[in-house]
Amino acid sequence: MLTNDEILARVRETEAIRHGHFALTSGRHSDTYIQCARVLESPDVTAALAQEAVRRLDVEVDIVASPAVGGMLFGFAVALALHKRFVFTERVDGAMQLRRSFEIPRGARVLVVEDVVTTGGSVAEVVALVEAAGAEVVGVVALIDRKTERKF
């Protein structure tokens, strides 16, 4: 099991943490930015972080679902660590929907995985899709949680 300090060290080894002034896609501003793509370009670090996320789960999962594009790589890594099916959502004409041909069965236990959560908007949209399919969201995992007000 990795400690929080060990997790931070693994992220730092990818040189993903930046300091300065950043305008985030949420419209907010920050003096620190974590470029998740730098973390995700390292298969070893991504796998270690996904395995740690799985170790910390205390729920049964049938399917992992992530929003495209950001959450897809980490979501797949978590699904691989769980040995579970992976699906993703994508935005079409401004609306979030399941990728063509993906299905979430009624009653499935779904773990939603995202790379970075700032406002929670994308996660809330994925949660709504899962629930509309008659499935249950059993948890949300994020590689980076900016600890702001949630919508889910």
Kindly give the residue locations of the regions a language model identified:
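Gly/Ser/Thr-rich beta-alpha loop segments that engage phosphate groups in nucleotides
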Residues: F22, H29, M72-L73, S122-V123
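Alpha-helical scaffold segments in soluble metabolic enzymes
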Residues: E6, R10, E52, A77, ...
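Short glycine- and Lys/Arg-enriched binding-loop motifs that mark or flank ligand-binding interfaces
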Residues: A16, A23, S66-P67, E103, ...
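Active-site-facing substrate-recognition patch
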Residues: M1-V59
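PRPP/pyrophosphate-binding module of the type I phosphoribosyltransferase fold
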Residues: R91-F152
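Conserved PRPP/pyrophosphate-binding segment of the phosphoribosyltransferase/PRPP-pathway fold
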Residues: E41-S101
